[in-house]
C-alpha cells in the first residue's frame, strides 16, 4: 500500500511535486477501473487534475476485488466526479454465444448497484448452458470426468479440453477424478 499511499500523500501535500508529476504524465490511462481502490482513484485524480486527460476502461458488472479494497463506486460515480468526461458504453459481445450472453444478462440484471446496460451478440445461440450442483468436490470431479469421457467418445481429443478453476486447491479433486477415469491431463 505504501507504493501508492506515499505518492498520494506527497502529491497532496507538495504542490510543486504535484505540478512536476502532472506535466510528466499528461495522459493517465487505467484499465479495470472497477477494481481500483480509494488510494488508486485519488492518485489518478491528482495526476490528471491539471490536463484533464484521464482515460479509464472498466465494467462495473465485472468488479471482483471488493474483498481487497476495490471500490466499485469509483466507476459508478465516475461521470459525477468528471462531468466533462465522454462515456462510451460497449454492449456488443464478440466472443460469447447468445445463450451465454442472455444468461449473463439475466443474472446481472438482478444487481441493483450497477449502471443500466444490456449486452448483445451477433453469434448464434450455441450449446445450451448446463448447471450442475455437485454435493462435494469429489462429486464435481466425477461429473467433469464423465462429461470429458462423453466428449472423447464423440471425437474430441483430450488436448482440446480445458478445465478452469478459481483456486489451486480445487485441482486436487479434479486430478484424482481424471486419474480415476483414465483421462490424460496436464496441469
Predicted features by range, described:
Residues 1-77, 90-96:
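Conserved helicase NTPase motor core
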Residues 83-86, 91-184:
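Helicase P-loop NTPase motor core
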